[in-house]
Amino acid sequence: MILITGANGQLGTELRYLLDERDEDYVATDVSQLDITDADQVDKVFSEVKPTLVFHCAAYTAVDKAEDEGKALDYAINVTGTENIAKATATHGATLVYISSDYVFDGEKTVGETWSEDEQTNPQTEYGRTKVIAEQKIQETLKHFYLIRTSWLFGKYGKNFVSTMLDLADKKEKIEVVNDQHGCPTWSR
């Protein structure tokens, strides 16, 4: 059985459709079914579902808000919630696929340069810091796991840069965007 956290988010939604196409058995949870910050609730869901594979897509992704008014929620979801998922994964003998972010790096590479998975992390934002701490909690808790660092996630579902630009193109004659950022878009499909 597969368990998905954050199943109504951009990546979780795409994952559900993909698993449906493959006729896989899964349980999809979102915050209304599973508060990942509540360790007892997490353990209860794991006991009921008995997953062998967990896609942990749930996250606090309001990067700008994480710097101030969302700081506590960012930590609770991205660190405490992820630690709860990792502990339950270990207890129940499942395999974890954790969705992290390129925000764990400092963004100092130039166009054309890429990061590798073994490079030193150096987050410059609160959001990035919580993702690094979450990765560390997973590494401390589990021997085997998959860690995926996405960048500029886009797809058919949810709000993202591509959908925002398409909406703006319908509403405005001229669109202005920043030109000092670069990244590697990750298709959610």
Q: In which residue ranges do the predicted regions lie?
A:
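NAD(P)-dependent short-chain dehydrogenase/reductase
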Residues: 136-188
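NAD(P)-cofactor binding segment of oxidoreductase domains
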Residues: 54, 68-97
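NAD(P)H-binding glycine-rich loop region in Rossmannoid oxidoreductase-like domains
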Residues: 39-77
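SDR active-site strand-loop-helix element
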Residues: 5, 29, 54-58, 96-101, ...
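Adenosine-cofactor binding site in Rossmann-like domains, unifying the SAM/SAH pocket
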Residues: 20-44
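N-terminal Rossmann NAD(P)H-binding glycine-rich loop of SDR-like oxidoreductase domains
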Residues: 1-21
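Conserved catalytic-core motifs of eukaryotic protein kinase domains, centered on the activation segment
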Residues: 64-72, 107-112, 158-159
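Catalytic helix-loop patch of NAD(P)-dependent Rossmann-fold dehydrogenases
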Residues: 76, 80-84, 104-148, 152-153
